Amino acid sequence: MSSGDVSRRQRVSRACDECHRRKIKCDQRRPCSNCIAYNYECTYGQPFKRLRHAPEKYIEFLELRLKYLRGLAEESDPNLKLPSFLAPPNDKDSPVNQSPWKRSDSSKRSSSQDEFESLFDRYGQLSLKDDGKADFRGSSSGFVFMKNIHQNIARNSTVPNPVQESNSSSSQPDPLSFPYLPPTPAEDEHKKPPLKIQLPPYEEALSIVSQFFMNDHFLVHIHHPASFFEKMHMYYKTGKTDNNFHFLLVATLCLGYTYMPDESPSANYPYHEAYEYYYYIRSSFSWEDSYTIEVVQILLSVALFALFSSRLSQAYTFTNNALLCCHELGLHKDFSDVLTSHESRLSKRVFYSVYVLACYTSTIVGLPLSIEDVDIDQSLPNSFDFTLENDQVPPRLIASECTSLEVFIQHITLSRILSHFVRKVYPVKSPSDSHCKVSLPAVRDHEEKLTYWWKNLPSYLKMSEVPKFSPKWIQAIILELKFRQIELIFYRPFIHSISTPIDNQNGSPMKPANFALKCAQSAERVVFLLQELAKSPNTPKLFFNLYSGYYALMTLTYCATLTKDDANKSNNFITKARLGFHCLQMIYRESTYYSTIMEAIKNLLIAYDMNSSGTENLDATPDVTGQLPNNFSQRTSNIPREFPQAQIFYSDAPYPGYYNPAQFQNAPTNFPMPTYGGRTQDQSYPRQNGYPSYSDGNVYPHDRVMINYGSSMPTANGFYVPNTYSPVPFPYNTSYPPYMSPTSNMPQAFQAYSQYPYQHPPFPLSEQMLPLPTSGVMMAPGAAKSGMPYPFIQPPSMTNQVAYPTVRDGSNNSPDHPSSSNSKRTE
């Protein structure tokens, strides 16, 4: 090689990357003239390398490697569905050799393998009333699920229904005509709100407020107990405070009255007082003028009471208003470096209480959630620093506050999971038709989240790890009830697959049937937990527990209708449903607020029995009363003992479990019989002697049998109920039979009551109908049993502060019955 060739090779240089790409001459400057002219970035990188050919047998090696990994995946999970691009190549089924029509069919088939058809459509349920109002419920609500149960029962019914035959031409049945549907909430416009209210005395108010803190405060932490009791003490002492705390105290008393049992002499007709406070807040409180944390607490308290009384639409409205106030105040952001320690902790608790309630109400109503998790930049709450020297804070509340915070944090985590999967399992949009398709990867993802939460739950929050009947045991059961209810909502779109074959040739459940089986197992677990709660003498009457049982019993009844071909399986489902109904009756028999939901469950079970064609013995109802402790109160009503505790069970009534109460021996026997879909009971009806007796938990002498829904009318409890009933057992133009007063030997009679069933309160608040005081000392429920310290026990001086009515017979000179003129009430 000559020296000229060597020098020529040395003069060869690398052009800049841009000139090399554009294949133009480069002057090799930094930057070059071309890059300067065109305003390019002049870079000198590594020279481009040509792609080399793959090594020999490289494709065969990848195929063997893929086959080995597929074998490992199938061994770990036989039901694992791998993506279509991992399938082995096949020349016959290659997309290249297929026509466009076959190619589109195969793509649809492969995409449908990863999607399951949901039980619900994307439309939900829109109810149009006669007055022009509309009420919409989404697919995740229990209203739509109950509509599906009705349609399935009517489809499988062996009993002819004249109403159904006459309406067979209509494609969409009227949900208000179903006798066992939960009635649609309505506005209480006919209720005239009070202009002024009377607050109870301080000791009585302290006991009532403590009921809320001891029952429901571990699931929603609304208040800071120390500051609340201090402001309450100053309010009663001076009578001067800001207007917001006045409404906050009224709202808290409204919630506290819902937990007052009838054994407590401190609350005469607590439900009437609660409703008066509720209407007072709705008519007098205006939150648009100012945004404070107290306003959020008031709206949240009113939303809780709306849930207690099954006003779901109003609860959704108040919760969204509270969430709007949180956005205006910036409670969803972390400002701990600006706020004080007390303000930061209170803002966290209030915001997450609103978040938990917003997730829950939006799910059970089926309406959109007003906040996304990506918008939340707020840390989880922590405990407050209590001052034990503060006499206004009950000592038991301090212990309850410290131990229940972990339950509240776990409740927040469950609410986050709930808000995530509702959008995936109950989609609003569907690309093809009205039927929704649920993605299998989305179901697997959220199923793993639920499983991870349950496996990592601390042992001291599981009922099997804590002492039985302890407060921690009750909290653990209630937390698991919340978890099982979320499982029911998660697996419910696949419940229609319960009738498909459960096992395939490999012995493992198929996916839709597996999800349906898990839904049924969660419902049975809820019944077991309710059975355990019914054994406890101090079970809190939470609306979370009632709605969990409500969803579980609907699921079990629906499973029983779907498995009619398998008698053993169907009988097992319906037996568990009856057991759960009796457990709910034992827990909520003293609460009037829950009578509407209990009535809906009872009518659902009766409708199933009326349409059942089996020969099983339905008279054998589950007996769980013998499992209660001896000291458990088995009262059946919240009406004071002065009034007769009468049920509407009679020997001539349509079901064999009815009986004639002793106090109504003089009852007329020619009262009209209730109707069933246009026919009376004396007409022939299949299996009319085989129905089980579903007793009413809260039935009063003025109640009517709610069997057939005709044209509906709104009542004061906010629900639509029929206005055409046959009075049982007395006509409403007569008085009720006499009863013996506990303070007089003279028989007295009730006056005829106005014609609306299940009015709240059950009797009007008047001095002639208030019970006599049992003693001069007023104590909170359970104070004598547990040794509850001050201020749960009312001092003897309290007898001069409580207003008692006069006796009906006019004898008001008893020393144990002070006159109402000496009462001191705070307005």
From Swiss-Prot:
Repeat in keyword set: no
GO cellular component, one term: cytosol
GO process terms (BP): DNA-templated transcription; positive regulation of transcription by RNA polymerase II
Single annotated GO MF: sequence-specific DNA binding
Pfam family, one: Fungal_trans
Coiled coil segments of this chain: none
InterPro entries (alphabetical): Stress_Response_Reg, Transcription_factor_dom_fun, Zn2-C6_fun-type_DNA-bd_sf, Zn2Cys6_DnaBD
Ranges annotated as biased composition (Low complexity): 159-179, 811-827
Keyword line: Cytoplasm, DNA-binding, Metal-binding, Nucleus, Phosphoprotein, Transcription, Transcription regulation, Zinc
DNA-binding region, residues: 16-42
UniProt entry tagged with the keyword Transcription: yes
Ranges of Basic and acidic residues composition bias in the record: 102-112
Subcellular location: Cytoplasm; Nucleus
Location of the region described as Disordered in the Swiss-Prot/TrEMBL record: 80-114, 158-193, 794-827
Modified residues (Phosphoserine): S112
Family to which the UniProt record says this protein belongs: Belongs to the ASG1 family.
Protein name according to UniProt: Putative transcriptional regulatory protein C16G5.16
Organism taxonomic ancestry: Eukaryota, Fungi, Dikarya, Ascomycota, Taphrinomycotina
